[in-house]
Design a protein with these regions (language model features):
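Flexible, gly/ser-rich surface segments that form the specificity/activation loops bordering the active-site cleft
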Residues: 73-120, 127-131, 147-159, 170
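C-terminal cap/linker of serine protease catalytic domains
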Residues: 74, 146-217
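Structural marker of alpha-solenoid helical repeat scaffolds
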Residues: 224, 262-263, 306-307, 339-341, ...
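Catalytic histidine site
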Residues: 2-36, 149
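Conserved active-site neighborhood of the chymotrypsin/trypsin-like protease fold
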Residues: 20-93, 98-102, 117-118
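Register position in tetratricopeptide repeats
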Residues: 241-245, 279-283, 323, 357-358, ...
Length: 532
């Protein structure tokens, strides 16, 4: 085995051996540590690349890997199913390009049980330097171990062998991406043996590896599980998501077709294809690929619904209809979902937003939103807080100002007070309309504290003070606004209104004139009314 580093320089050389005719081989883990790629050279001098690591154990220094074999099959050794007893003959098979290779003979001195009833051997046998990881066989020619060096004074008379059956038991699990032993090797890792574990592995990999590596894993999955629609659908999704040219979408379309062909549960595949085309259209492509329209997505979800009317399919139908701006039909779909076991805060929220698009009665929209929030765990947690914020705005639209203010309070508590100036401004708007003037003043002061350069807040502060007859405070707020921007026309208009209330007609008219000069169009009526 020849190991190369990141710079494609030889890092290590060592031994290994095939244990299956389709190219699975064993060697020592320490040989592969730091490898970026590896090749094997057989006894005939033929080179073949190592395709994937299939499992490793650093404690017992073993690795299992797959070679991309260049022939239909390769000569392989049979792994012994029964561990040899103490005193049994042991034969070490060296690597040799010569026909007259000689085995090193010895005996099993000690058998130690390791993980899950596997064995680790001490052998009465001297090991030469270049024999590490050569196979150790029993009298029947079956391999029971991988040769390992002894250390110190023992090297002259004994060596060790890690159990070949133990090395064969190494594998990739759904959580192997986080395994530091495997991460120390740059060569691609194989997939877990079962489809279920392999799918979890893909899910974890999708957020941890590069796009290129992920597509390579999907290719492996499709090869390993050719009758699973999941591999084709995930690969299609990757082509759609990263697609820039028709060639990418051609590949995606071909994978969608293959998924349909191999699927036993066709409705699930129709649903997946519909969702992919829907998401593709949501991304607003400059030029639509073939017939990948919302209409086509709708056709596919209808095909799924014809087989099984699952609520999740109805939900997608509603989403597509919403995107097509067919709001009454979308609302009908969301209504069905809300009467099913899929009903959730999100599904009621979808219905409420659809009603908004239909200009429904604001109070009816709030009732729908009440159903959304009633399904959230109470007290409302940070994850569901955005729903409360939405209902606050809906309550404002329905002129239910006190309810809106209470929603803002609930939101504030849900997010532990982690809010910005805009929040305080919105809650102030609810408070002033609910005639909670002191709360309005407190909130607008807080908004100004968080964002002192926002002139709207200072104008609002003046308006609230004006509303409660605090004219001096109103003028002070306006002076502060003009200190930030002397050309802020609205400040002069509000100043004029304030001065009218204070019976300062002349000053008021001067303020109105200044507002008009600075381009305020709302001041004309006031000039007509108060300034002859």
């Amino acid at each position: 085995v020849v190991i190369y580093d990141k710079n494609d320089k030889i890092l290590n050389t060592g031994n290994g051996f095939f244990v299956t005719e389709d190219g699975v081989a064993l060697s020592d883990y320490s040989l592969f540590k730091g490898a970026e790629r590896a090749v094997i050279i057989n006894s005939e001098g033929k080179q073949m690349p190592v395709d994937a690591v299939l499992g490793a154990n650093d404690m017992y220094d073993v690795i299992k890997f797959r070679v991309a074999i260049t022939e239909k099959k390769v000569p392989a050794l049979t792994v012994a199913t029964v561990a040899p007893a103490v005193g049994a003959e042991a034969y070490l098979l060296p690597y040799s390009t010569q026909k007259d290779r000689t085995c090193t003979q010895g005996k099993v001195k000690k058998v130690t049980k390791i993980e899950d009833n596997y064995s680790y051997y001490t052998l009465d046998m001297r090991l030469k330097d270049k024999m590490v990881s050569c196979p150790v066989a029993d009298a029947n020619g079956q391999v029971f171990g991988l040769a390992q060096k002894a250390s110190g004074q023992d090297t002259a008379s004994i060596c060790y062998a890690a159990g070949a059956a133990f090395a064969m038991s190494q594998g990739i699990s759904a959580l192997s991406l986080g395994d530091i032993t495997l991460r120390n090797i740059g060569i691609k890792k194989g997939l877990p043996d079962t489809e279920e574990q392999a799918l979890v592995y893909l899910y974890v990999a999708s957020s941890q590896v590069s796009q290129e590596e992920y597509v390579s894993l999907l290719d492996d999955f499709v090869k390993q599980f050719p009758n699973s629609p999941d591999g084709y659908l995930r690969r299609a999704s990757t082509f759609v998501f990263g697609g820039k040219e028709d060639a990418d979408f051609d590949k995606a379309a071909a994978d969608m077709e293959r998924a349909l062909k191999v699927a036993k549960k066709k409705d699930d595949v129709y649903y997946n294809i519909s969702k992919q085309i829907y998401n593709y259209q949501l991304g607003k492509p400059e030029k639509t690929y073939k017939d990948w329209t919302y209409e086509k997505a709708l056709d596919y979800v209808h095909s799924a619904l014809a087989i099984d009317s699952l609520p999740v399919y109805v939900q997608l139908e509603g989403d597509i209809l919403f995107a097509k701006q067919d709001y009454p039909a979308a609302l009908a779909c969301y209504g069905k979902v809300n009467r099913s076991n899929l009903a959730s805060p999100a599904t009621f929220f979808n219905a409420a937003k659809t009603m908004e698009m239909m200009d429904a009665d604001p109070k009816e929209i709030v009732i729908m939103m009440d159903s959304c929030i009633a399904r959230c765990p109470q007290p409302v947690a940070v994850a569901d807080a955005p729903y409360v914020l939405e209902r606050a705005q809906m309550n404002m639209n329905a002129e239910q100002y006190r309810a809106a203010m209470l929603d803002y309070d609930t939101y504030f508590n849900a997010v532990s007070g982690q809010v910005n100036d805009v929040f305080y401004y919105y809650r102030e708007q609810a408070a002033i309309k609910a005639r909670q003037y002191q709360r309005a003043l407190d909130d607008i002061a807080k908004a100004i504290e968080l964002n002192p350069k926002e002139l709207t807040y200072r104008a609002e502060q003046a308006v609230v003070n004006l509303r409660v007859g605090r004219y001096e405070e109103a003028l002070k707020a306006l002076d502060e606004a003009l200190a930030v921007d002397p050309k802020y026309a609205e400040a002069y208009r509000i100043m004029g209104i304030c001065q009218i209330q204070m019976k300062k007609q002349e000053e008021a008219c001067a303020s109105f004139a200044k507002a008009k000069e600075l381009g305020d169009t709302n001041v004309d009526e006031l000039i007509k009314k108060h300034c002859k």
